[in-house]
């Protein structure tokens, strides 16, 4: 399945919520009619079945983290194998992706931009270049920007933007050095309450 390359706001309107696909800290509902479906007049949203609601939630989370369907299913399988709550395990795995950590640390304005930094070999983990976006960052790992990439205007702009966002408590970032430490895996209370991971578990449990 190919990665979606179309308008980002269209996806957010389809899901009826901000997927944080665009840079900036201004709420997306000030940029577009988030409650209105894509289209000139906004297609009327049909009443969804339980399955439809579960599917929409899965699609929403998958798009937030920029993960393809097969990858997402594999994350679910891994989450189900781990001890503890499957839904919370799933979110922890998604949050542990290197591209997401780079975004959370403020080195990329969006997850897509962070993913590009990783693929362009601008990111190091514990002093070693890692160019795999899905690489799982472990507690106490140090993530940093390579020296030659520190002068990139997009990195500096992203860091300025990050100053306006709430800083994740599970990360420790030194903006001056352009590096950060992944102190621990985030707990459920650290993450967005707008995600209903139990719906995804119900979907895949069928």
Swiss-Prot record:
The gene is rpsD. Residues 96-156 form the S4 RNA-binding domain. The keyword Repressor applies. It comes from Escherichia coli (strain K12). One of its GO terms (cellular component) is cytoplasm. Keywords: Antibiotic resistance, Repressor, Ribonucleoprotein, Ribosomal protein, Ribosome biogenesis, RNA-binding, rRNA-binding, Transcription, Transcription antitermination, Transcription regulation, Transcription termination, Translation regulation. One of its GO terms (molecular function) is rRNA binding. Part of the 30S ribosomal subunit. Contacts protein S5. With proteins S3 and S5 encircles the mRNA as it enters the ribosome, which may play a role in mRNA helicase processivity. Some nascent polypeptide chains are able to cross-link to this protein in situ. The rRNA transcription and antitermination complex (rrnTAC) consists of RNAP, NusA, NusB, NusE (rpsJ), NusG, SubB, ribosomal protein S4, DNA and precursor rRNA; S4 is more flexible than other subunits. Gene3D superfamilies: Ribosomal Protein S4 Delta 41, Chain A, domain 1, RNA-binding S4 domain. One of its GO terms (biological process) is negative regulation of translational initiation. It holds the Pfam family Ribosomal_S4. Belongs to the universal ribosomal protein uS4 family. Transmembrane segments: none annotated. One of two assembly initiator proteins for the 30S subunit, it binds directly to 16S rRNA where it nucleates assembly of the body of the 30S subunit. This is Small ribosomal subunit protein uS4. Changing residue 51 to D: In rpsD101; suppresses a temperature-sensitive mutant of release factor 1, R137P. Not a ram mutation. PROSITE patterns: RIBOSOMAL_S4, S4.
């Amino acid at each position: 399945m190919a990665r979606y390359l179309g308008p980002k706001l269209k996806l957010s309107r389809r899901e009826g919520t901000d997927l944080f696909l665009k840079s900036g800290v201004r709420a997306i509902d000030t940029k577009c009619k988030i409650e209105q479906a894509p289209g000139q007049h906004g297609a009327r949203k049909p009443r969804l079945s339980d399955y439809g609601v579960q599917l929409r939630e899965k699609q929403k989370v998958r798009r937030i983290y920029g993960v393809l369907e097969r990858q997402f299913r594999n994350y679910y399988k891994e989450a189900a194998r781990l001890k503890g709550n499957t839904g919370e395990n799933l979110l922890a795995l998604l949050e542990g992706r290197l591209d997401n950590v780079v975004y959370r640390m403020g080195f990329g304005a969006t997850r897509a931009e962070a993913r590009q930094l990783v693929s362009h070999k601008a990111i190091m983990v514990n002093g070693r270049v890692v160019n795999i976006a899905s690489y799982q960052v472990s507690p106490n790992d140090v993530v940093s920007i390579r020296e030659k990439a520190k002068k990139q205007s997009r990195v500096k702009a992203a860091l300025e933007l990050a100053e306006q966002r709430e800083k994740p408590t599970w990360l420790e970032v030194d903006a001056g050095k352009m590096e950060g430490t992944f102190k621990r895996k985030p707990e459920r209370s650290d993450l967005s309450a707008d995600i209903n991971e139990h719906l995804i578990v119900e979907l895949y449990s069928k």
